Amino acid sequence: MAADATGASAATGAAKTPGAADAPGAAGGTGAAGAAGAAGGAGGAGGAGGAGGAGAAGAGLHSRHRAVLPDWLALYYDRPIEITHGEGRHVWDAEGNRYLDFFGGILTTMTAHALPEVTKAVSEQAARVIHSSTLYLNRPMVELAERIAALSGIPDARVFFTTSGTEANDTALLLATAYRGSNQILAMRNSYHGRSFSTVSVTGNRGWSPTALSPLQTLYVHGGVRHRGPYAGLTDERFTEACVADLEDLLGHVRPPAALIAEPVQGVGGFTAPPDGLYAAFREVLARHGVLWISDEVQTGWGRTGDHFWGWQAHDRNGPPDLLTFAKGIGNGMSIGGVVARAEVMNCLDANSISTFGGSPVTMAAGLANLSYLLEHDLQGNARRVGGLLIERLRAIGAGAAAVREVRGRGLMIGIELVRPGSGEAAPEAVSAVLEAARGGGLLLGKGGGHNTSVLRIAPPLSLTVAEAEEGASILERALHCA
């Protein structure tokens, strides 16, 4: 099995958590509600170890779904499940089956399902006022912006709230192109940045980029995928040197671009990452050309990688990015996204703007409560500790599975790449089979990867306990026999 793509073990090294409180004790003691105590959790019909498929009610809802929603709207499983409620790290479907959630609604339920602190904040704010728009002063929005600006690491930071990661990246691209007077963008191969007209055009993954039409001119560079491509066989140092040389050569052939947009760890691309320091080396080159750096932290932010609060901190030798985008986990399920940028860049637009739904009082209240819980309970530290143990356990499992090419990741952002044994070819059919088998065993996973969707993605809530990590690994070990 190939070596870890990220280098050093995820379980080692001091965490960089700006402003976080000390950990409250053992990894399991995160204080989340309900099922936080043990792997068994609250008992629901079906149990975690033997979830059944969708019944007649589920089949009927699936038929209605297909009748009124787009064909291109992806659904997991041959018989899709309807999730009706959740608690801690578990969710239940309409048939009463309980599942251990190792994907968190695409890395969005970051803290825990039904976290009392968040539901209380949402309920209390909704009872006062749900909506006002950005035309009026909004105390929760200002307070959350202040906290995020302080945590961002960007000097003289300004924050603009959106409702999704797509919209956040779209806004960052608008700011960068306006500031630089250029519609040319550098992006990474195998990347994903959203589903809007501008963000699909900077997405370097054809499975998620349905059109080549674009308001931007996009140039793709090497570096996001460590163990595939022309530089895969190089050492980390030589890999970085080759990618920097490629960037230098590219910039010598084009007019100066507006920005480079990059995920520190590629999310939809299969949780793959370059060697630490690559984007710092890129930044040195970009700075000479006046090109901005946008760090897409939609999936990597808020301590998920364990070692760092932001993904860009693994590449911080030459300072923070010019712009940072975020979404998903900060709302713990509420629709929050946003952009952080230094004031000079954020204030470059010469026209008025508003946001009708971005920064709504209810979502901001959720974000404040969730961020406070995250920091007070040191969930970044929990991600580092429990994630490190989980990665080691999965590597041990993978060492005995011919279909496993690589187990990679940091913290609670883990990818398992599957191949056809003996060939090294991507095995999307094996990923689908394991996904189904894991669901049957009571475990929800994600999938991704630019090479024909050949990666299992593991990203549970950051309050995951050691017992739950072991439970999930055991279910996955059995499911891998289907690969």
Question: What is the predicted function of each stretch?
Answer:
Residues 2-3, 55-483:
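Conserved N-terminal phosphate-binding loop of PLP-dependent enzymes in the Aspartate aminotransferase
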Residues 1-56:
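Small-residue-biased low-complexity repeat regions
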